[in-house]
């Protein structure tokens, strides 16, 4: 089972809000997921992102692959840097 960390669209028409979910790569975008690890609101001027950093780092260390957009959000939040530092320290 290949696991991805990706966005799931929520909110109403023309007002998107996203959850950052861990899901099987074969599941549909808004379908079944394993765990919610954060949220992303692109409509706020500062692009509000909330994350459960420990859970994201755990999923990344277990081999979950982030989508391109999620990878950018994690990089801006500093999570990818922590992940690479922990990977290099082993």
UniProtKB/Swiss-Prot annotation:
The keyword Ribonucleoprotein appears for this protein: yes
Family per similarity comment: Belongs to the bacterial ribosomal protein bS16 family.
Descriptive protein name: Small ribosomal subunit protein bS16
Top-rank taxon: Bacteria
Organism this protein belongs to: Lactococcus lactis subsp. cremoris (strain MG1363)
Record Pfam families: Ribosomal_S16 (PF00886)
GO BP annotation list: translation
GO CC aspect terms: cytoplasm; small ribosomal subunit
Family matches, as SUPFAM superfamilies: Ribosomal protein S16 (SSF54565)
Signal sequence, start to end: none
Keywords: Ribonucleoprotein, Ribosomal protein
Statement: the UniProt record of this protein carries the keyword Ribonucleoprotein: yes
Molecular function terms, GO-annotated: structural constituent of ribosome
Residue ranges of coiled coil: none
């Amino acid at each position: 089972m290949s696991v991805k960390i990706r966005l799931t669209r929520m909110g109403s028409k023309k007002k998107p809000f996203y959850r950052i979910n861990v899901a099987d790569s074969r599941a549909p975008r808004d379908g079944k997921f394993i765990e919610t690890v954060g949220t992303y609101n692109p409509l706020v001027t500062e692009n509000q992102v909330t994350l459960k950093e420990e859970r994201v780092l755990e999923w990344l260390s277990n081999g979950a692959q982030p989508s391109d957009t999620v990878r950018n959000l994690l990089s801006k939040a500093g999570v990818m840097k922590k992940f690479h530092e922990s990977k290099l320290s082993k």
